[in-house]
């Protein structure tokens, strides 16, 4: 069995309004960013250590999503106190490489977690499981939750420790699946 992260953190979607969960004493909210908030995506993705080469525009095009856990600035354009971020694409097949993923424009029922990073211990795990919960509720057509992870020992340990199963070892990537 896996430990379930604190369910008090909720994902907020929409225009990027900073809506804080009243139970969360840290004033940090997890939020979905849509295509109207390119400035926010640019602000977040400039720190992406996993896949910095993926353009910000692609990350929110064709149904792709960017989630973050942090606080937005007063003018709603910048993120402060960010503890985690995760980018998700929806595909019909599991990609074996970054190039394969970005060259496909088809949307599907497999959620591909292609980048996740955090600045606080445990925040990466929290954001993954919070996103899975969000997708189960808001995108019930999603049937699988799979990663496109760099082929590193750190990524391997992270996903295995969090209950994922290694389903493919590719030339430059791993695919892990979360059976939740």
State the predicted function of each range:
Residues 60-84, 89-92:
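A short helix-loop-beta-strand connector motif used in the catalytic cores of GNAT acetyltransferases and
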Residues 160-170:
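Conserved acetyl-CoA-binding loop of GNAT-fold acetyltransferases
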Residues 172-180:
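C-terminal "cap" of GNAT-fold acetyltransferases
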Residues 121-136:
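Conserved acetyl-CoA-binding loop-helix of GNAT-fold acetyltransferases
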Residues 111-123:
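A short, internal acetyl-CoA/4′-phosphopantetheine-binding micro-motif in the GNAT/acyltransferase core
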Residues 21-65:
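Short amphipathic alpha-helix that is part of the acyltransferase structural core
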């Amino acid at each position: 069995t896996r430990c379930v992260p604190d369910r008090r953190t909720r994902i907020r979607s929409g225009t990027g309004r900073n809506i804080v969960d009243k139970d969360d004493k840290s004033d940090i909210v997890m939020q979905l960013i849509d295509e109207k908030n390119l400035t926010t995506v640019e602000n977040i993705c400039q720190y992406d250590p996993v896949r910095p080469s993926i353009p910000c525009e692609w990350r929110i095009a064709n149904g792709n999503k960017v989630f973050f856990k942090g606080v937005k600035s007063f003018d709603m354009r910048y993120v402060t106190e960010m503890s985690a971020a995760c980018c998700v694409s929806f595909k019909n097949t599991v990609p074996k490489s970054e190039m394969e993923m970005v060259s496909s424009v088809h949307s599907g029922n497999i959620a591909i977690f292609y980048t996740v990073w955090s600045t606080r211990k445990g925040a990466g795990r929290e954001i993954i499981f919070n996103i899975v919960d969000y997708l189960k509720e808001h995108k019930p057509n999603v049937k699988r939750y799979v990663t496109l992870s760099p082929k590193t020992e750190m990524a391997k340990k992270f996903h295995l420790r969090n209950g994922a199963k290694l389903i493919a070892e590719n030339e430059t990537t791993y695919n892990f699946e979360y059976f939740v």
